[in-house]
């Protein structure tokens, strides 16, 4: 029986490997804006983003991008979306950082990011919840008909900063499953404490409340660019 990408990435073995496995550095992703290191961890392929390799961002002065990467994964899991690869925080050769399961043989995105698929819809809603300011085409991972999202370092800002290429769902009504998922997110402090500031957690709760009140996907902003640049 075939196992989905989500099921593969959520196995106990993968979690144990990323958490406790020996780290072998393979190489660096040279196109990344912050240090992103491809490695083997307990035999599992992963991307290691050390905090020491993060460039300072004037509009994200608090916390670390690695913490936000982990927080995005935890929110995806809490919602039941399972649309972010397994991501943990641990010590590495260059200090603490995020370790995210590498999705082998990801496919070319092409024009598929324009589709109104259920998988992209989950990611669009996740982005609205975590206030993703950098959902680019290249941050979508396609494999075997499934779609995952990566690169969530610039998320959870307390000010509204949503920028994404997934605006095809704008102003659509939330379905009952999405509303139920949002209602389960009433106490995010339980799994986000230590990763985000209290102000950021408070803003997250406000965004969730607003989505439930409006019952719709948000519209693109009119007072700043709605799409990140470059879009890929």
Q: Which residues are covered by each model-predicted region?
A:
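Phosphate/dinucleotide-binding and metal-coordinating scaffold of catalytic cores
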Residues: 1-232
């Amino acid at each position: 029986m075939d196992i989905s990408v989500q099921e593969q990435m959520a196995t106990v073995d993968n979690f144990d490997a990323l958490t406790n496995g020996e780290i072998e550095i393979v190489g660096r992703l040279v196109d990344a804006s912050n240090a992103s290191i491809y490695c083997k961890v307990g035999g599992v392929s992963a991307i290691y983003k050390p905090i020491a390799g993060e460039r300072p961002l004037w509009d994200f002065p608090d916390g670390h991008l690695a913490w936000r990467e982990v927080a995005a994964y935890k929110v995806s899991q809490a919602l039941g979306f399972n649309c972010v690869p397994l991501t943990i925080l641990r010590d590495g050769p260059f200090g603490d950082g995020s370790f995210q399961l590498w999705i082998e043989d990801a496919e070319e995105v092409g024009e598929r990011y324009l589709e109104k698929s259920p998988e992209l819809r989950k990611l669009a809603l996740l982005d609205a919840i975590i206030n993703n300011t950098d959902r680019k085409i290249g941050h979508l991972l396609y494999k075997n008909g499934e779609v995952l999202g990566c690169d969530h370092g610039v998320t959870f800002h307390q000010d509204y900063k949503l920028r994404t290429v997934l605006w095809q769902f704008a102003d659509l009504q939330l379905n009952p499953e999405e509303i139920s998922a949002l209602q389960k997110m009433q106490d995010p402090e339980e799994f986000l404490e230590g990763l985000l500031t209290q102000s950021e957690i408070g803003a997250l709760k406000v965004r969730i409340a607003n989505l439930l009140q409006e019952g719709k996907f948000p519209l693109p902003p009119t007072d700043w660019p709605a799409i990140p640049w470059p879009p890929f």
